[in-house]
Amino acid sequence: MALHEGFDPSGSPSFLGSKGTKEFDDLVATVRRDFPAIAQARLAFVTEEKDLIPEGLAYDTNQNLFYLGSLNRKKIVKIDAEGRVSDFVPANRYDLLPVLGIRLDPADGTVWANTFEDAGRTELVHFDSAGKLLGRFAPKDGAAKHGFNDLVVRKNGEVITTDSLNNKVFRLDPQSGAFLALPVYRTLFYPNGIALADDDRSLYVADAVGIVKVDLADNSSRDVDPGPRNTTAAADGLYWHNGSLIAVQNGMGSPRIAAFKLSRDGNRVTRVTVLENRTQFTTLPTTGAIRGNDFYFIANSQIDNLNGDKIMDVTKLAAVRIAVVRLP
């Protein structure tokens, strides 16, 4: 808050004990004055299966449909252009772990998804366009915990995934099934969102501190300079769009959707556009997907109502809403 970067503590459970005090209320009022609510999104889809607890969303350009992963049901559903929802990978078919990030292979349209449970067991799974399992890959390095979270797929089919529990980024060698750690110049703190630029070389990894850029050609890395009065921290979802990074920031107090325009070399933020802030669509967003110039995102993941494999309060469950906002 002292850095004046837009952090709104009213949405963070860490500050529950301070709510209602004059000092806290004054701080919140200052933040909200300088970083006002922005409402540009609209409702796109609703899924009536209230206990999905969705975390991953991906768009299939060829079939014009979305894939939505479920933490609670441990399955993947698809949503067609008319908003009809059906199972893509039904629960219990392949004994999946809770489903997180989902991305498509740009070459063949197959679907990759990360799965992991809080205890530290994780798998990267691969499906064809009909939902048939093509492969499943788990780390075999003996580490106590792994948690594959989000991922990208390169033009050659290589998969790169964040590991939130091991604080690393891994590349999958599809021939051997081994995961190779990507060298990063600093320690990562709960790496989560990940995006790949159109050059198929510049990789952006979001963690609790900010965004790290990795050059996949020479493995050099550096922090993306957020610029003054801005934070790139805590992006759950991160996506590349026309020289900008689209971020779902849900770990910085009150969540927001933001677009970070980058310099030509991709090393610094030159302009920040807050797309949605403190509205009904930023209750607890997690990830999203880009279709054309529109960004679709999970508006109310309800992830805070899930403890391990259990819904804490079923009376609080609501229909899952997917919102959409126009990109700059």
What are these regions (language model features)?
Residues 3-32:
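TPR/TPR-like alpha-solenoid helical repeat scaffolds
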Residues 33, 37-43, 120-158, 162, ...:
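Asp-box/WD-like beta-propeller blade repeats and closely related beta-sheet repeat scaffolds
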Residues 40-48, 84-94, 132-141, 178-185, ...:
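A short beta-strand motif characteristic of beta-propeller blades
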Residues 79-84, 128-132, 173-177, 215-220, ...:
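Short loop/turn segments that connect beta-strands within beta-propeller blades
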